[in-house]
Regions:
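Non-catalytic nucleic-acid substrate-recognition regions in nucleic-acid-modifying enzymes
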Residues: 2-134
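S-adenosyl-L-methionine
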Residues: 5-11, 15, 21, 37-50, ...
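Hydrophobic, well-ordered secondary-structure segments
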Residues: 109, 113, 117, 137, ...
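Beta-rich nucleic-acid/ligand-interaction surfaces
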Residues: 133-142
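Residue-level detector of conserved catalytic or cofactor/ligand-binding positions
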Residues: 190-199
């Protein structure tokens, strides 16, 4: 299986090291995300142990699209029945487009949802879906007309782990805070005071 781990821009190298430390093979590093290979256990392990990732997605497909028709056909060509059961609740939770001809997130989401419905109608021989079962949110990234689609396994964003137990005037996302610490020479045998006062 192939997975996508989005992260804050500039933290790709930190996330890559985390993934390698978990024992998984990184297949690509791009702006704001790292793609890696793993088995089904990687879904749980990545969601629990990756401190700098925003979420973990199962990569379900990728293709080139410059028009909404190409987006529709590419999305419909994905075997959604392998991921979404007949009663599954599915939607495109987020669409991000950078330097692509298709740039309207709401239009991208709408076209993709229609394509998913058309695919599942053909497979399940149904005209209407109650979507009363488990949730299957989908996320899509467009970069220079290259479309990458992932199925979200995380739910609430991973930056909300331990969310706001202690508040401050300028709170920082937990995954960003973890990345900042990982970029310092600190290790578990040192107190954090060594970061700001290295002479102590």
């Amino acid at each position: 299986m192939e997975f996508i781990a989005p992260c804050h821009f500039g933290l790709e190298a930190v996330l890559k090291k985390e993934i390698l430390d978990l024992g998984y093979e990184v297949s690509s590093v791009e702006d704001g995300r790292v793609t890696f290979a793993g088995d089904e256990n990687a879904i749980c392990r990545a969601n629990v142990f990756l401190r700098t990732a925003e979420r973990v997605l199962v990569k379900v497909g990728s293709f080139h699209a410059e028009t909404f028709e190409e987006l529709f056909q590419g999305t419909r060509g994905i075997a959604w029945e392998d991921y979404v059961p007949e009663d599954g609740k599915f939607w495109v939770a987020k669409a991000a487009s950078i330097k692509s001809r298709l740039f309207s997130p709401s239009d991208i989401q709408s076209i993709m949802k229609k394509a998913m419905v058309e695919r599942l109608k053909t497979v399940y021989h149904k005209e209407w879906f109650a979507e009363s079962g488990a949730s299957f949110p989908v996320r899509v990234f467009l970069l220079k007309d290259e479309v990458v689609i992932g199925l979200d396994t995380t739910g609430e964003s991973l930056h909300k782990r331990g969310y706001r137990k202690l508040t401050a005037k300028a709170p920082i996302a937990e995954n960003l805070a973890a990345a900042l610490i990982m970029l310092t020479p600190w290790h578990k045998d040192l107190s954090l005071i060594h970061i700001s006062e290295p002479t102590r």
